[in-house]
Structure formats: C-alpha cells, structure tokens
C-alpha cells in the first residue's frame, strides 16, 4: 500500500480527533492517526490513572522492595542489583543499548501507528510512567514528529524492544526523526520545535520499549487495509462475472444465510448480489436449466452442449473463499484490538496489589493472527490470479479471445505479459512461511521462547502489497474483457462504475503498449481506495 507522509508542525482538520485512554482504541482510530494526521490527546482519566500508578510504584521503590528493571539489571542480568541512585543512567543505558535496529525504516504512516499503539498501551495506566511521557508521545503525533524506526531487530518478546527503543531515543533527544522519509537527528528537530528532551526516571525506559506495539501498530494498519482489499477483490470478481455472463445462482442468500451461515461468507455473497444488481448480463440458474432442457435431443443417451449449468470455482466460490478471508480478518481484528488496549510491559503496578512481574510483553497472540492473516491474504491473491487466468486462457474464457487481444492474436500479445507478474507474486506469497513458530532463544536463554510477531506482521504487509499488483492486473483485464466482448451497456451500475474508474486511469488496450505504467497506475488507485469509492457513489453500501 502507498505510505502516507504527515507534514511536521500541523494536524489534519479532516480526521476525527483520537483520545487515548487505554480502553477504546480501534483499528479505524489508528488509521486516522497514522494516515490522516488526526489530532491526538490523552484522556484526563488516563493521565490521573498514570499519576496514581506512578505514586504506587514510587512507594514500592522507596520502601526498598526490589523491582525488576528498576533496582535490578535487565533480562538475564536480573541477578545484578542496582542502587536506586542510578535511576536515570539505568533507564537511559537501556534505551541506548537497545536502539540497535537495522535495515529499512518504517514508512511514516507505519511508524505513527506504532507510536499510537505504544501511547495507548501506556495510557492504560498500569505502567508507572509519569503523565509527561504520555503527553510527549501525543505531542510528537500532533506535531508530525515521527521517530525513524528500523524494521529489523524485534523478536516479539520481550515485545518489540529494538523498534520501540528507537522511539524512546527521540524522547531523550537521541536517535532520529523522519523528514521527507529520511532520518534527521532528533536533538536538532527538538530544538527547532522548542522542546527539551525528557530525562527518564525509574522504569520509564523499560516501559517505553518493553511491549508489543511494533507488531500491533503495524498489524492494525495491515488489517485495516486488508478489509479494503477483500472488498476490492469482491468488486472485480463481480465485474468478471458480468464479463463472462455468469450466473447469479451461487450468490443467492438461501445457500449462505440458511445453509452455511459463516458470517464472512454471508457478507461476501451479499456484496456480490449488491454489485451485480441491475446487470443485464448475468443469468439466473432457472434459465440455464431451461436452456439445457431445450437443447436436449430426443433419443440420445449422451449429448454434448455448449451450456454450462455451473462455471468454474473461481467464478462461483467467491463467497466461500473471500468469506473465509473475511472471517480470518475478523478474528485477527478482534485480537489486535484487544492488544491495542492492553498494558503489555513488565512489571505492572496496581493499587493495593502485589507488583505484577509477568510476561505481557509476549507477542504470541498477535503473531499467530498475523500469520493467519498472511495465509488468508495469500489465498485472496490466488483467487484473483486464477480469475485472471480464466479470462486470458481462450480454452477457459467462455468465448473471449486469447489474452483479451483486441487486434490480431499472434501479432499482438494482449495481457500475456501482464499475467506474469501476477503469477510470480503468487509464488512469492507462497514462499512466506509462519513466523510465529520460529522461536530462537536469546538474551542468555532468558528469552528462550519468543513470538517473532513483528516479522509476522511484516510478512502480512508484504502479501498485502503483492496482492495490490495482482488485483491491478485483474482490474485491467476485467475492463478489457468488457471491451472485447462489447458488453458495457449491459453492465450493472456498479460494473459500469468500476469499468469507468479503470478507464479514467488507463485507455483501452486496442494494441500492445508498455504495460508497466498501467499496472502501477491501477495499483496506486487501489491503494487510495478509488474503486471502493466509485462503487459506493452508486449508493451501494458494501459490508
């Protein structure tokens, strides 16, 4: 998906404000912050709760009670006792030593999503950070000051230590912010905005970096965009059904609502019915049966006809395939939204309770569902590529010319070449194995089972991006299938809107031309949600 850049020094007036309270952050709100530059604030209740948690925590420390990461070393070095007089040095050293991420930087929208996820986890009020820490992260988001976060370095337990350390570095005036996609020293950026670096107190370095906010913030964006991608797949599937004069029968409500009531299947079937409503090209199954009966010759025991009562799976199993994707996304969304509103560092502090030394930083729940999302999105891409092949292969396309060539086949190749990147990307998607079972012990075997959750989220993002190109080729081919069959006039309102949206971007393929630009153009439009908007402008409310 296309990444978004937020201008420094300004807050978007178009996106609804987001209040961080540790309880109600959802994927839509993360996207408003990450992509839309929504104004951010921490609720007064969360600030008060943070202050109370801090007071409880300081009472514990002042009573001489040992606390991990406050009066001890970190990780495997927990056996080392550290005098409280070293509070700032201990926290600062942790941030510096763990700012060890490598590789490409997260784009600005993804980095903002990660900051938002960390802010909300701390806003839960059990992490014992001062309210000033929460307010500083919210200020960064409002000013468009986005930490430069390398993508590689997290094991997913103890949370996303390395990525989050790069955020914490900017809080203390070290590390880098992004400017135009490039890193700029944080101390310089803070001076330009009249901000002083914060001095970390007991536990604050640990609280900032010890959590699942990398995988959760990125996962929230992937899931939000994944929901859009499944709708985009439904839209182009409907257009292809029209182009090959498919049947409405497989999408009738009884077969889904009554017979097999998986929520995703029901929703995809409903969307296909809405998208095909008003089409003069689709046929009813009852009419097909009549055609078969009329074609039967008396006295023949076996007879070949050109009438297909059912078309191939790729043209009638969309409710089952894309509905399965929907159900996967729904499960993953529920788990990620729970994690967005969780205190996922260690230790945690509760009024009148024992200090909780645990492992809420472990990203296994998120890692599992991001792997599940990768599987589901991979199958979405497979369906799209098989539908594409169906209209390009003259033996399978129900009368359409080979490779949708508008002129002379052989002299012209049509979409023969454009199919290759789609097929290659399917193969690439299939090479991505589960990350959530790839635990490798680290940290002196203290971290002896880890989740690799951020790798799982990055894998899902990779498939999402690959699918954008697969769908782009399918949208182009679907529009050309309408052209070569001269079926535009019979399209449904949604079909015409989809076709028109494609043709507003690229002209008809009447002769071979340089194809890469067409694919990139349509892929970018998919990233902007233009085809969903075109359909919704026809008063179609997609589920």
Predicted regions and their residues:
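N-terminal glycine-rich flavin-associated loop
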Residues: 30-41, 108-139, 208, 212-215, ...
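Short secondary-structure capping/junction motifs at helix and strand boundaries
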Residues: 143-152, 229
């Amino acid at each position: 998906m296309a990444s978004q850049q937020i201008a420094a020094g300004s807050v978007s007036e178009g996106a609804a404000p987001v209040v961080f309270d540790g309880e109600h952050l959802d994927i839509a709100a993360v996207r408003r912050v990450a992509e839309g530059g929504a104004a951010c604030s921490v609720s007064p209740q969360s600030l008060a709760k943070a202050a109370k948690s801090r007071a409880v925590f300081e009472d514990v420390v002042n009573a001489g009670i040992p606390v991990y990461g406050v009066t001890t070393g970190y990780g495997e070095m927990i056996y080392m006792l550290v005098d409280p007089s070293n509070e700032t040095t201990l926290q600062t050293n942790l941030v510096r030593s763990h700012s060890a991420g490598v590789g490409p930087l997260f784009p600005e929208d993804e980095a903002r999503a990660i900051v938002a996820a960390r802010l909300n986890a701390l806003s839960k009020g059990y992490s014992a950070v001062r309210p000033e820490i929460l307010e500083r992260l919210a200020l960064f988001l409002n000013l468009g000051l986005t930490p430069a976060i390398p993508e590689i370095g997290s094991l997913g337990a103890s949370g996303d230590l390395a990525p989050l350390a790069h955020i914490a570095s900017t809080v203390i005036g070290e590390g880098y912010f992004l400017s135009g996609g490039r890193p700029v020293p944080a101390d310089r950026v803070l001076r330009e905005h009249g901000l002083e670096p914060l001095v970390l107190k007991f536990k604050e370095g640990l609280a900032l970096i010890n959590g699942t906010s990398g995988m959760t913030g990125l996962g929230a964006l992937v899931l939000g965009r994944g929901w859009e991608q499944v709708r985009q797949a439904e839209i182009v599937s409907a257009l292809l059904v029209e182009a090959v004069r498919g049947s409405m029968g497989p999408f009738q409500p009884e077969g889904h609502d009554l017979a097999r009531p998986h929520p995703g299947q029901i929703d995809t079937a409903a969307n296909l019915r809405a998208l095909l409503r008003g089409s003069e090209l689709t046929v009813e199954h009852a009419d097909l049966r009549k055609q078969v009966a009329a074609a039967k010759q008396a006295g023949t025991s076996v007879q070949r006809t050109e009438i297909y009562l059912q078309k191939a799976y790729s043209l009638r199993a969309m409710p089952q395939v894309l509905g399965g994707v929907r159900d996967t996304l729904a499960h993953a969304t529920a788990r990620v939204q729970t994690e967005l509103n969780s205190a996922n560092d260690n230790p945690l502090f509760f009024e009148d309770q024992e200090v909780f030394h645990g492992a809420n930083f472990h990203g296994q729940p998120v890692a599992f569902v991001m792997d599940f999302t990768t599987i589901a999105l991979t199958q979405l891409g497979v369906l799209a590529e098989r539908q594409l092949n169906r209209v390009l292969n003259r033996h399978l396309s129900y009368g359409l010319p080979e490779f949708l060539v508008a002129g002379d086949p052989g002299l012209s190749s049509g979409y023969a070449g454009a199919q290759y990147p789609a097929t290659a990307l399917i193969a690439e998607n299939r090479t991505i194995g589960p990350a959530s079972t790839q635990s490798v012990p680290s940290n002196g075997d203290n971290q002896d089972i880890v989740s690799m959750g951020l790798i799982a989220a990055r894998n899902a993002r990779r498939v999402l991006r690959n699918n954008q190109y697969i769908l782009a080729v399918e949208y182009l081919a679907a529009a050309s299938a309408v052209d070569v069959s001269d079926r535009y006039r019979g399209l449904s309102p949604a079909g015409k809107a989809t076709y028109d949206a494609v043709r507003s971007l690229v002209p008809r393929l009447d002769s071979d031309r340089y194809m890469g630009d067409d694919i990139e153009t349509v892929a970018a439009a998919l990233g902007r949600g233009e085809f969903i908007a075109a359909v919704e402008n026809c008063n179609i409310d997609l589920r």
